[in-house]
UniProtKB/Swiss-Prot annotation:
The lineage of its organism: Archaea, Methanobacteriati, Methanobacteriota, Stenosarchaea group, Methanomicrobia. The active site is at residue 10. Transmembrane segments: none annotated. CDD domains: proteasome_beta_archeal (cd03764). Component of the proteasome core, a large protease complex with broad specificity involved in protein degradation. GO terms for biological process: proteasomal protein catabolic process. The 20S proteasome core is composed of 14 alpha and 14 beta subunits that assemble into four stacked heptameric rings, resulting in a barrel-shaped structure. The two inner rings, each composed of seven catalytic beta subunits, are sandwiched by two outer rings, each composed of seven alpha subunits. The catalytic chamber with the active sites is on the inside of the barrel. Has a gated structure, the ends of the cylinder being occluded by the N-termini of the alpha-subunits. Is capped at one or both ends by the proteasome regulatory ATPase, PAN. It is found in: Cytoplasm. Keywords: Autocatalytic cleavage, Cytoplasm, Hydrolase, Protease, Proteasome, Threonine protease, Zymogen. The keyword Zinc-finger does not apply. NCBIfam families: arc_protsome_B. This is Proteasome subunit beta.
Amino acid sequence: MDNDKYLKGTTTVGVVCTDGIVLASEQRATMGNFIASKTAKKVYQIDDLVAMTTAGSVGDAQQLVRLVNVESQLYKMRRNESMTIKGIATLMSNFLNSNRYYPMMVQLLIGGVDKNGPGIYSLDALGGSIEETRISATGSGSPMAYGVLEDQYREDMTVKEGLDLAIRAIHNATKRDSASGENIDVVVITKEAFRRLDPEEVKSIRASLPK
């Protein structure tokens, strides 16, 4: 299966920092050359301190979000603790692989903070899982995003610095990838809290970037 045929029209980014993680996505949804939405949601909270970004089929992505939300809540009720990020990634990987003959056309980033610290996993449509220890990007704009991430990332980055880098990477992708654009949705997760940035805060950071 050629993932590039389906995993398009999106740029999502994940950055692991010393004190948490940042997940970000632009919000354009396309149908061929038609811009179907300028406010599409692609970053979902799936547990108290875990979130997931989606690239690919909107319907498949929403089904997976519902599934992982239910499974993570059931786990918490039964064990009185949250699933680890690796546990959630493994759950999703197994589910995607079980549907490999009728694959869900998605690519996911699952990230957050658990007892083992901050982390991000990248999953393809067949459930292949790769732990990205520092930076991740998916979607049609990912080559441009990776250009920024690999050039400017530092291992000692704080969440504040990672936030600026993630927005810069998405911003750079939207300038070159016609299927990525509009607003940027950003989530910051530390061991203390899950926070989705206000659109005005994102605009302020974006406006400060070099033209």
